A protein has these predicted regions:
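C-terminal segment of classical bacterial N-terminal signal peptides
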Residues: 18-26
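Active-site beta-loop-alpha junctions enriched in small/polar residues
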Residues: 185, 214-218, 268-274, 337-339, ...
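Feature activates predominantly on carbohydrate-active enzymes
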Residues: 113, 117-301, 313, 321-324, ...
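Hydrophobic faces of well-ordered beta-strands that scaffold small-molecule active sites
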Residues: 178-182, 209-211, 265-269, 332-334, ...
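Flexible, acidic glycine-rich loops studded with aromatic residues
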Residues: 375, 386-526
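Acidic, contiguous N-terminal accessory segments
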Residues: 2-11, 15, 28-173, 324, ...
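Conserved, mostly hydrophobic/aromatic
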Residues: 64, 81, 133, 180, ...
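Active-site neighborhood of glycoside hydrolase catalytic domains
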Residues: 282-381, 385-402
Length: 526
C-alpha cells in the first residue's frame, strides 16, 4: 500500500467516526486500554512485567523531571511527545514535587544494567526511568516511546487519550555493538536522508551507523588534500544517476546529529579494491599513470590501488588523517573486500603498510572479514559477510583475540530481495524473508566464533538498486528491528512465534512515521 493510499484510508476512518458522532477522546473517568504492554517491546527486554492496573495517563499537567546529566535526553523526549499531544511537557530540574511526571534519573540504576541498560517503572502516578549513563536513558526512552499509543508518532496534534502501559522493565544489551550500514557510494543520499535513517534506526537501540563512503561508482567525502576525489569522483553513481558528496562540514554535522541519537558514525573507505572512483579522479593512483573512465555498472573485483607506488600510501595517509580528524568514534573501516585483482602478496603488503597508518591517527581498524587473512592487530574487528558457516581465517582471528562483527550476507544483508518478485534489491546471497533474517544467532552461525568472540551484529544496506528514502525504508523494514533484537535481547528469550506477534504491533507506528515498509505475509499486521 502506498503512503498516499494509507493516509486516504486513515482519513476515511477518522471522518467516519466524526460522522457517527463518536467522541474524539475518552472521558476522564473512562478506562482506555493501552495498545501494547511492556512485554510487546522490540527489541525484547531482559525482564518485563506488565501491570495493566498501573497504566499512566499523560496529560496537560505532566512534566518531565530530570537531573543535569539527563537534560539532553529529557529535551529529546519532550520533542518526541509535544507534536502529537499538544502538551507543554516542561523539562524541570529535580525529582521532587507533586503532580504527574515522567522522571529521568542518571546514576541510580542497578549495576546489573551496565552502561546502556535502564530500569523503567510505569505506575498510575507517573513514570520513572533510571540508568547509569545518558546512553542508558536514551535507550530507555525508546522503550517508553513504544508504550504510548502509535499516534504519538504523528507530527500534528491528535485529540485522544495518551495511556502509557503499566509495569516494570529491567533491560540491558546482549552485545555492545549494534549497527546498521548505509551504502551512500553506489547511490548518493543527502544529509537529510541519512538523518532520517538515523532517526529510524535509533528507535530500535542501534548504536552505530557504518557509512560506506567510497566505491567504484562514487566517492562521497571531501578530502581537502585530494579535492578531485569529491569534485570528480563524487559526480558519478550507478546507472548514471546524479552523484554527490558530503563536505567535511556536512559530515561533521551528520556525526553530531547521530551523536544526539546516541549513534556513532563509522566511516568506510574501501581499499585496495573498489577504488575506481578514486583512480578515475587521480590518474597517478594507477600503476601506468594513465587516466581511466568512470564506472556506473555494478560489477565488482576489477579495481585496485597500485600497491608498489609510494603515492598510494601518501593518498591513504592523507585520507585517513583527514577522516580521523572529523570522526570522534574509535573505528575507521578500511574495507578490504573483493580485491580480486590484487594478488595475495600485494594484499598483504598493502595491509602491512596501511594498518600502522590507521593506528598513527589514533583509530582502530575494522573492515570486511577479508582482512582477517592479513593477521591484523588483535584490536582490529573483521566483519563477517560470508554465506557459509565456515571461514578458517575468521576463526583463526577469533582464536588470536580479534572480536568479530557478524553480518552474514544470507541472513543480515538488507538489500537482498524478500522474494523473487521484490522490485528492489539483489539475490546473489539468497532471498531473505523476515523469518530468515530473524531466525539465526551470531554466536553459533560461524564455526570457531562463539559468544565471547562476537562484538555484535550489523545489518548492511547496499544501494545498487536503491535511489530514494522510500527504497531504503522498504528494504530495511520490517527486517531491521529483527537484527536490532538479535543484537540486544537475550538469546533464550528470542523465538520467531513470539517475535512475529510483537513485530506486528510495530506497524501502526511505522504508518504514523510514514515508513514505507514491506508487508510480509509471514506477519499478521495490525
Amino acid at each position: 500500500m502506498s503512503k498516499r493510499l494509507s493516509r486516504t484510508v486513515l482519513g476515511v476512518a477518522v471522518l467516519s467516526l466524526v460522522t457517527l458522532g463518536l467522541p474524539a477522546t475518552a472521558s476522564a473517568g473512562q478506562h482506555v486500554k493501552a495498545e501494547r504492554t511492556v512485554a510487546d517491546v522490540v527489541p525484547a527486554p531482559v525482564d518485563a512485567k506488565p501491570d495493566p492496573r498501573s497504566d499512566f495517563r499523560l496529560g496537560p499537567a505532566t512534566v518531565i523531571r530530570t537531573d543535569r546529566e539527563g537534560r539532553q535526553v529529557a529535551e529529546y523526549l519532550a520533542g518526541l511527545l509535544r507534536p502529537a499531544t499538544g502538551y507543554r511537557l516542561p523539562v524541570v530540574s529535580g525529582h521532587r514535587g507533586g503532580g504527574p511526571a515522567i522522571s529521568l534519573e542518571t546514576g541510580h540504576a542497578s549495576g546489573r544494567v551496565g552502561a546502556e541498560g535502564y530500569q523503567l517503572k510505569v505506575s498510575r502516578s507517573g513514570v520513572s526511568l533510571k540508568a547509569n549513563t545518558d546512553d542508558g536513558l536514551f535507550l530507555g526512552v525508546q522503550t517508553l516511546r513504544q508504550l504510548l499509543p502509535s499516534a504519538i508518532e504523528a507530527k500534528t496534534v491528535q485529540k485522544r487519550s495518551w495511556v502509557v502501559s503499566g509495569g516494570t522493565v529491567l533491560d540491558y544489551p546482549r552485545f555492545g555493538y549494534r549497527s546498521a550500514m548505509l551504502d551512500v557510494a553506489r547511490h548518493f543520499f543527502t544529509p537529510d536522508q541519512v538523518k532520517l535513517y538515523i532517526d529510524q534506526i535509533a528507535q530500535y537501540k542501534i548504536n552505530n551507523l557504518h557509512l560506506h563512503l567510497s566505491d567504484d561508482q562514487g566517492w562521497r567525502i571531501e578530502i581537502k588534500s585530494w579535492p578531485k576525489l569529491a569534485t570528480v569522483g563524487g559526480q558519478t553513481a550507478v546507472g548514471g544517476a546524479p552523484g554527490g558528496y558530503y563536505t567535511q562540514e556536512q559530515y561533521k554535522d551528520l556525526v553530531r546529529y547521530a551523536a544526539s541519537r546516541h549513534i556513532t558514525i563509522v566511516p568506510e573507505i574501501d581499499m585496495p579494491g573498489h577504488t575506481n572512483a578514486a583512480q578515475y579522479s587521480y590518474a597517478e593512483l594507477n600503476c601506468d599513470g594513465k587516466p581511466i573512465p568512470p564506472r556506473t555498472d555494478i560489477e565488482v573485483g576489477y579495481s585496485s590501488l597500485c600497491i608498489g607506488k609510494d603515492i598510494t600510501y601518501k593518498f591513504v595517509d592523507d585520507v585517513i588523517r583527514e577522516l580521523s580528524a572529523i570522526t570522534p568514534g574509535k573505528y575507521i573501516n578500511i574495507g578490504g573486500d573483493e580485491a580480486h585483482s590484487t594478488t595475495p602478496e600485494d594484499y598483504q603488503t598493502f595491509a602491512t603498510k596501511v594498518h600502522p597508518i590507521v593506528a598513527k591517527y589514533g583509530k582502530t581498524i575494522t573492515g570486511w572479514h577479508d582482512i582477517a587473512k592479513t593477521k591484523p592487530p588483535v584490536s582490529a574487528v573483521p566483519q563477517f559477510w560470508g554465506t557459509t558457516g565456515t571461514d578458517a581465517h575468521v576463526a583463526e582471528a577469533a582464536a588470536r583475540g580479534n572480536k568479530i562483527l557478524m553480518s552474514p550476507a544470507n541472513k543480515a544483508y538488507l538489500d537482498m530481495k524478500y522474494h523473487p518478485q521484490t522490485p528492489l534489491g539483489l539475490s546473489w546471497a539468497g532471498l531473505i524473508e523476515v523469518k530468515t533474517g530473524y531466525d539465526w544467532d551470531p554466536a553459533t552461525y560461524l564455526q570457531g566464533v562463539t559468544e565471547k568472540n562476537v562484538i555484535g551484529v550489523e545489518a548492511p544496506l547496499w544501494s545498487e538498486t536503491l535511489i530514494t528514502s522510500d527504497h531504503i525504508e522498504f528494504m530495511a523494514f520490517p527486517r531491521l528491528p529483527g537484527y536490532a533484537e538479535i543484537g540486544w535481547s537475550p538469546k533464550d528469550s528470542r523465538t520467531w512465534d513470539a517475535y512475529r506477534l510483537r513485530l506486528a504491533k510495530q506497524s501502526p507506528r511505522w504508518v504514523q512515521q510514514g515508513i514505507d515498509f514491506y508487508r510480509s505475509t509471514q506477519v499478521d499486521w495490525k
